[in-house]
Amino acid sequence: MAHVRTFTLPHYEAYPVHVALFKDVKNPSYLKSQLLEANPAFDYAFLDAAMVARLGIAWWSHAAANDRPQILSPTHLLSTTFITIHALCTHRQKTRTPHSELVFRLSPNNNIGESYKKFGISDTTTHLIAVKLPLKSSDAEAKEWLVDGEITNESVSQHLGSVVEGTSVEISEKGEELGQWCDIDKIRKVYKLGDGSAKKGKKGAAVNGDGAEKEGEKKQMEVVILGTIALKS
């Protein structure tokens, strides 16, 4: 079984969000192929972990060249998940499924294909975030999304543990682990945040490379990114 952390979002307590984190993933091509084949058993948002920052959760108590993930922080991921669920519940979704909607909402542009290239699993992904939303369509046209009671922490844990060839990483209550492999430069590029050169010396090195400096940089980026995602919605 895989470690799965279940988060509850404000106002949408009926829709628990199940999240798993893996490192040293050895079968990304297989997982991606199942998504492309629309295998219902693999209905997840499989995200390359290089695009999330490690900041913790305050308000709810294409892989990088060096194989580092693109979710900036747990707040980055879960805020986007909140917007995704809200879009589905208010019939404002732009894509066909809850999980494709989540990937779409993470991206700053309106191209779903580009969203998957930037945030989705690729053939070279080694650090993986899997998100499972407990939603099912009431009809073929997906006019209404209902809670799927068969999706539980245990069911997600069992399935992911059997299909993902990698090391399951336990996620704490605050979810800081979700951003531990983020690629800051990749995230800056995707969200067009500049290169952060104001904080670097002549050789491109950070003037202050300590943890507080890095966390402060991530926090500033997070504010801009969340604003971008909110405006898109």
Curated annotation (Swiss-Prot):
UniProt record similarity statement: Belongs to the CGI121/TPRKB family.
Keyword field contains Nucleus: yes
Source species taxonomy: Eukaryota, Fungi, Dikarya, Ascomycota, Pezizomycotina
Protein name, UniProt field: EKC/KEOPS complex subunit CGI121
Matching Gene3D superfamilies: CGI121/TPRKB (3.30.2380.10)
Major subcellular site: nucleus
Keywords for this protein: Activator, Chromosome, Nucleus, Telomere, Transcription, Transcription regulation, tRNA processing
Keyword match Metal-binding: no
Superkingdom, taxonomy of origin: Eukaryota
Subunit structure: Component of the EKC/KEOPS complex composed of at least BUD32, CGI121, GON7, KAE1 and PCC1; the whole complex dimerizes.
Pfam family, one: CGI-121
Signal peptide range: none
Compartments where found: Nucleus; Chromosome, Telomere
UniProt-annotated stretches for the region Disordered: 196-215
Function description: Component of the EKC/KEOPS complex that is required for the formation of a threonylcarbamoyl group on adenosine at position 37 (t(6)A37) in tRNAs that read codons beginning with adenine. The complex is probably involved in the transfer of the threonylcarbamoyl moiety of threonylcarbamoyl-AMP (TC-AMP) to the N6 group of A37. CGI121 acts as an allosteric effector that regulates the t(6)A activity of the complex. The EKC/KEOPS complex also promotes both telomere uncapping and telomere elongation. The complex is required for efficient recruitment of transcriptional coactivators.
GO biological process annotation, one example: tRNA threonylcarbamoyladenosine modification
GO cellular component: chromosome, telomeric region; cytosol; EKC/KEOPS complex; nucleus
